[in-house]
């Protein structure tokens, strides 16, 4: 071979070797990057991960706390509205009875037939008691009933006209009422002894 050709081939080999070493260097850098983390680096990564989890849990807690606070405020508002407007249904059902009473009062001023006025008042009373029953109010029975201190309050004791009426209610001075089976006013009664 010609010395020129030898030189040329030698140069080509040098160029190829330079390329090979240049290609190997980045691989060495990549190998270093892919190398396992040191103990210190691993601990730092775990710490960062733990802090991220803590931040996430803290955010969830704050959101849940705010949601519960809003729920509490909303239920308090609803409860206050129920207390203020709870009797609205009952009052609304009584209003027609009040209208009937107003008409009866006007009629009484000019009426000459007392019997008709009495019948009108009795009709209004019956209508009112029906409205009360619709709202859960019931009259406590007293006639010929034995004294029951859960429902009755004995305000007087008198001698019983017969042996069968001893310990029983002879007269009701004031009617008692229950609301949804809870006594709201005891019946005031006279008992035989």
From Swiss-Prot:
Transmembrane segments: none annotated. CDD domains: GrpE. GO terms for biological process: protein folding. Participates actively in the response to hyperosmotic and heat shock by preventing the aggregation of stress-denatured proteins, in association with DnaK and GrpE. It is the nucleotide exchange factor for DnaK and may function as a thermosensor. Unfolded proteins bind initially to DnaJ; upon interaction with the DnaJ-bound protein, DnaK hydrolyzes its bound ATP, resulting in the formation of a stable complex. GrpE releases ADP from DnaK; ATP binding to DnaK triggers the release of the substrate protein, thus completing the reaction cycle. Homodimer. PANTHER family: GRPE PROTEIN, GRPE PROTEIN HOMOLOG, MITOCHONDRIAL. This is Protein GrpE. The gene is grpE.
């Amino acid at each position: 071979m010609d010395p020129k050709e030898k030189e040329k081939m030698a140069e080509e080999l040098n160029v190829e070797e330079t390329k090979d070493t240049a290609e190997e260097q980045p691989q060495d850098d990549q190998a270093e990057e892919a190398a396992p983390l040191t103990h210190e680096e691993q601990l730092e990564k775990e710490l960062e991960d733990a802090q991220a989890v803590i931040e996430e849990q803290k955010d969830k807690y704050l959101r849940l706390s705010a949601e519960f606070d809003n729920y509490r405020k909303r239920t308090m508002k609803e409860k206050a509205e129920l207390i203020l407007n709870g009797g609205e249904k009952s009052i609304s059902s009584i209003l027609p009875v009040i209208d009937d009473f107003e008409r009866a009062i006007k009629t009484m001023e000019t009426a000459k037939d007392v019997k008709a006025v009495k019948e009108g008042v009795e009709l209004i009373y019956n209508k009112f008691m029906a409205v009360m029953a619709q709202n859960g109010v019931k009259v406590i029975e007293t006639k010929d009933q034995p004294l029951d201190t859960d429902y009755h309050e004995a305000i007087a004791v008198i001698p019983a006209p017969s042996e069968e009426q001893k310990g029983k209610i002879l007269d009701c001075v004031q009617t008692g009422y229950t609301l949804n089976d809870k006594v709201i006013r005891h019946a005031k009664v006279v008992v035989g002894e």
